[in-house]
Structures are given as structure tokens and as C-alpha cells.
Amino acid sequence: NFAPSSSRWPTFWPYDPNPPAHPLQQPYDPITDPAPLNSTANPGLTHTFVLRSWLDAKIPFVPLLAIPYLSFLALTPIILVLNLWMSSFRRFLTAGLALIVSQLVLDVGYLLFQTEVLRDTAAQEVVAQGGFGGTLVKMVWGNDAPFNGYPSGHVTWTTIGILGLWRLRKVIPKTAWILMAWMALVYPATVMLRQHYLMDVYAGLFVGFSCYWACMFLVERPRLVPKVDPHPWPGT
């Protein structure tokens, strides 16, 4: 992830320059807009949209959720292998193609609509203190800058992974349910680690579901109506 230059977006959104009635200007520019929380970007270097809602301000910071957030990188290819090994090549192809198509959709979104997550002071202080949780969050923050957040790639790929596991729940029930429950922790982790806002999560769910089902109909061609019996019972 990277920040666009300050000239990427024109500052055409109106706002009241007189505090305290000054709402956050969109796109956000650290030079002219005082952030509601401390920004992670250097002043003047970014020019991004901030999708922070009133509900985002009430979400707690939970460093330990970095564990499922980081494990997502290992679980995604495992789910693909399970679909190929325990199910069929078509289901494997559906999941794999959905991941590729969804990433292309995300890339277009990131190109046209650049966002930034403003990490609050309390979260930054926890990370600065170190410890087990702080170290985990440093791993997340150090490898994933708070840009390119709408829609959330983690949420999109997690949704595709859970849909793939859902279709394996009768083949390997214990494994499928355990992995689905664990991967579901990625959803709250994205906002509780200050990586995304809730709008990113909602959009990621939509992209994940849409891409998976579109690829499923393209690859597997499921029947939408029951097959007609060519030799029905007499009198029926």
C-alpha cells in the first residue's frame, strides 16, 4: 500500500474553515484539515478519503486480533488445497478464480478511490509500549500501510475462503467449522487493529460474495431448477 501525492485529488468538497465547526474535508489533506485523531501520514504527503463513521470511534483497539489477521495469509492457500483435495477441481477453480477476479476489482477501486485510516493516539501508544500485543501489531502495521482500504482485501478474501469452507462442511465438518470460525475473526480484526473502517468491511463482504457466486456460475454452471424426470411415475 502507498499514499498518493497531494495533487492526486482536487480539494473541491466544501467545508467551514472556522473551528470548532470545521468538519473533516474530503478528500483529507493533513495540511488544511485537522484530523479527528492523529494521522499516520506525514503532513502534506497524502490526499485521501477518510471513511470514518461515528461507530468507528466506538470500536476498541484489540492487539491480540493480530494473530488471526496474520494467519489469514497462510489459511487462504490451505483452503484452496482443501477444495481440490476433498471436493472437486471445479470448486477449486471457482475459489481460485474468485480470488483473482476479486483482486482485480479491488485494484480498480484502489486506483480510483484512495482512502486512508487515521490510527488514533491510544492505539499508537499501545504499540509503542511493546509487549506481545504491541509486537504483533507492529508486524501488521509495518507490512500493511493504512491506504488502499476500500474495499478491504482481507475481508474480501476471507469471505471467499469461508464460502469455500461452507461447501466442505459435510465432507470435513470438524475442519471446515473450525477454520470458518477462526477466519471469521478476521472481520473484527480489520477494524480493531485500525487497519480499516466499517465501510471497508461492508464493501469487502459485497465484493467477496459477488465474485465467488459469479465465478461459481461461470465455472460450475449449477442448475437453478430441479431436473425434470423424463420417466415420471404413472398418474403423476
Language-model features: where?
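Active-site His/Glu-centered metal-binding helix of metallohydrolases
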Residues: 71, 156, 198, 202
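Aromatic-anchored segments of alpha-helical transmembrane domains
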Residues: 1, 103-109, 181-192
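N-terminal transmembrane-helix/juxtamembrane module of multi-pass inner/ER membrane proteins
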Residues: 1-76
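Alpha-helical transmembrane spans of integral membrane proteins, capturing the lipid-embedded, hydrophobic core
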Residues: 66, 70, 74, 99, ...
